[in-house]
Amino acid sequence: MAGLRGLLVDLTPLRRSRDFRLLWGSQVFTSLGRQVTVVALPFQVYVVTHSSLAVGLIGLAQLLPLLATGLYAGAIADRVERRLVQLAGKSTAFLAAAALAAGAGLHFGVWWFYLWAACGSAGATLDQTARAATFPRLVSRGQYPAAAAMNQMLFQGAAVIGPSLAGLVIASAGSAPAFAVEAVCVIPSALLVLLVSRQSPAHDAARIGWRAPVDGVRFVLGRRLLVGIFAADLIAMILGLPLAVFPALALSVFRLGPTGLGLLYAAPGAGAVVASLLSGWVSRIERQGTAVIVAIVIWGAAIAAFGVLGDVLPIGLLLLALAGAADVFSAIFRNSILQLSIPDAMRGRMSAFNLIVVTGGPRLGDLEAGLAAYLVNPVFSVVSGGLGCVAGILLLAGLLPELRRQRAGVQDQATPSSSTAKTSVALGGIGPTPRDP
């Protein structure tokens, strides 16, 4: 039994910290609602346009406000009471979800969905940045890996339940009620945030200004290890993420209907849930940099294999589940490496930078996948993306030995990657951000 407990996810942060329980519970509702929209939005756009490229352009619509607000949202989270920043983001997300529901019910054109997808992205950026900057305050340093694993388990659980629920709701009632689910979920999420203890800004936080985003960029660019961590995630998401072609595969190629579409979106989350539940061993892995590389190779190979064998639905779902498991282990190890790199005064800015990578990468991945499907076909988009991911991460591993050599508990010493290292800060901290839609 002791050996089995060592494999299962560590629930200590949930037991010991009231505020962690509240914020974690708030995120349950937020993630569930967003994951329903993750299916409903591309479904609606594909039904209106019958174009994978149009679906991919959702990613571009979401990326622009993410970039525009991301780093400044981090600076705000470093200077303003973080619960208020979260509530501002949740209010914006509520309006966006309600507008999407109205647009689907009234059969508005595709421009309406691009517009409110952008607004929802801005709201999610505010919410997620402040939340990610708050989590590390709520647990002890020794519980950071367990807290990161629990956050991943939460998101991936929502990534199974949300898409499955979306498929059922869309099949029975259409996409408008599916969008309404997110609006409803925002309400208890906001109430739980209000119950969290006041989260005052750090005393040494930088003043909000136009140079605030530059501080975060310099902090990353001054450390080759951090450059490698963020580049690895971008390679996996931009090249290997096939979500934008799922509507075409499910509705036009495999003929699975809305319920089958929900299964495709849910399968990676199912694999990730199993991986999260069996994540108790991750703290014992010494060579965490190598673990990131191996996990991303498995992710890319599984995605490419799905493109070849996905017409056999059970095999396709298993391959997507394997990819999801690899992704969650990659995220856990990347976040563990980040723990010793971020001071509390910069957590907001660095959480925003991390957020831009882990959510901006998938948006670019949507655009890449949709464009490849438009130029060739959806199957080519999936296979070429997976193989490109494998090649890209192996190339990165060769170019950045710091990533390969990184070991657990070894603090990054700010190995210069450019002249910006002269202005970098060398302090310890954490800024893990679970991947969100």
Task: Say what each PLM segment does.
Residues 1-436:
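Alpha-helical transmembrane-bundle signature of multi-pass membrane transport and export proteins
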